Amino acid sequence: MKIFSRLLQEAKNLFYELQAMLSSVGARVDIDTPYVCQFSIPEHAEPSLKKTLDPSADPHWKETGASSPERYAAWAFTMCGMASTAMALGYFKDKNIKPAELAEDALRSGVYSEDGSEISSMKYKEFANWVRKYGLVANVYSKLSVKGIQHALSQGKLAIVSVSPNIRGYDTAPADQRGGHLVLVVGYDRDTGTISINNPSGFVNPNSQIKHSIPVATFKKYY
């Protein structure tokens, strides 16, 4: 069964990539989505990640929709996918649902599992099924080229992609990890050779949160 599922997924990937290859995409796409940080407020992303602010002691924890400081702390470093989903919901459905509220609902629906203090990574198949309740249709691709991403955006879609967390500081941070962090791709510019992301754990200054423009060649190293 697992082999069949994998072959089916690979066929789905191939079919989509062929569509993307044969299609023409615009020179530039720039989608204005709301920005949602996976931490309490955008200014607290950097100190939280640099361990100078303990999420359980964050005075703004309620901003995420968490039910308690403890639940915010449990989710803070795992909420990138839910923050990206909240941005998509804000754009497509004009819904303002907090990321921690989405996270707890997703947990109940099997998108995540929790064992003690450990919360798993997002389960993509379960995510695609779960997000339908909010009126979104998600397609899961295990491999997607940059042209495939551009094809999706040129059709008015958004793409949540898995990248290295180090992409927020790509000019200084090593590309020694691929995947592990979810961001929302909101645009590209073929003339300048760049791709733009909304990064739920980006920093305020210099900006790596909202429409963070990255050279495609660099993006590929972290994608």
Per-region residue spans from a language model:
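Conserved active-site-adjacent core of cysteine acyl-enzyme catalytic domains
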Residues: 5, 9, 13-16, 20-23, ...
